[in-house]
């Protein structure tokens, strides 16, 4: 597939490979939170195409879900949405996926900052962000400024439109 005269497939395949390895590590328990406990809950924080596509896919494939993992979705800027999701979460075993093309979407970033504060408050260290947050974004630098390790950022191209983002790292 060519875009702007460049073959984009090598980059897409590299990201898909990294996503597979990360997913397998979470599912197997090899990826752990700050305290060394395996992840049990994954919370997707996004809005629009960064929420609807993943939510649809999770629902459609729910019969094939990993039995040790729960998935929650937070998209409403009303704090009650995040609060409701966090009631079922243990900070030591929760992984947040911040899904934002630009990593500046107001609603998504408000929820991400609140989730980050909840996590850091509970675990007592900013270092926990690197083990409990991943980003799906075109803006690797902003995700890094948020505290997300570069290896935990799964990029996609800025030409991917929101309604089509389900076919990307989102």
Give names to the regions the model predicted.
Residues 1-34:
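Extended, charge-enriched "interface" segments that sit outside catalytic cores
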Residues 24-29, 36-170:
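Glycine-rich phosphate-binding loops that contact phosphosugars or nucleotide phosphates
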